[in-house]
């Protein structure tokens, strides 16, 4: 299921790129033909060939949908009992911030906005959204958990300097 969802998201991203004309039509068509021949995705081909800048995609999505974007979000797990992680991953949402009243989610496709209202009812808090690079969401879906950064102090056993013998 995760592979199908990732493929669907990449197709949706490719359609969005075409709609916003973020790459030249000839380049898009060439990468589409290549993706069809190799069984890959247009989105991946465009990234691999450096034909697409994620920053441009985020700016276009932000301006069209009136939401902010963030290029370097910090995914996190909210302090909510029985947080609906599976629902979030199924709807391409990952939590990136939390206050007492609002949980902020990162999205990469506009269809994810439809799930925010139901999610708000599930968690009992207001929700807001920001567009983030698709990499974060695709990675979370593939590995079935939210990738968070952990601030772990270094152990006393780990030495900063290499010893010369």
Outline where the language-model segments fall.
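N-terminal, intrinsically disordered, highly charged
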Residues: 1-165
């Amino acid at each position: 299921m995760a592979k199908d969802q990732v493929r669907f998201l990449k197709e949706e991203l490719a359609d969005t790129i075409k709609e916003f004309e973020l790459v030249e039509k000839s380049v898009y068509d060439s990468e589409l033909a290549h993706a069809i021949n190799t069984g890959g995705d247009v989105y991946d081909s465009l990234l691999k060939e450096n034909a697409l800048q994620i920053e441009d995609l985020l700016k276009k999505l932000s301006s069209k949908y009136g939401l902010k974007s963030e290029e370097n979000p910090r995914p996190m797990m909210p302090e909510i009992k029985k947080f609906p992680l599976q629902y979030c991953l199924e709807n391409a949402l990952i939590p990136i911030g939390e206050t007492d009243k609002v949980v902020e989610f990162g999205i990469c496709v506009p269809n994810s906005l439809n799930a925010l209202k139901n999610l708000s009812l599930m968690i009992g808090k207001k929700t807001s959204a920001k567009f983030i690079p698709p990499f974060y969401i695709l990675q979370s879906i593939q590995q079935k958990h939210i990738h968070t950064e952990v601030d772990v102090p270094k152990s006393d056993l780990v030495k900063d300097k290499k010893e010369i013998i």
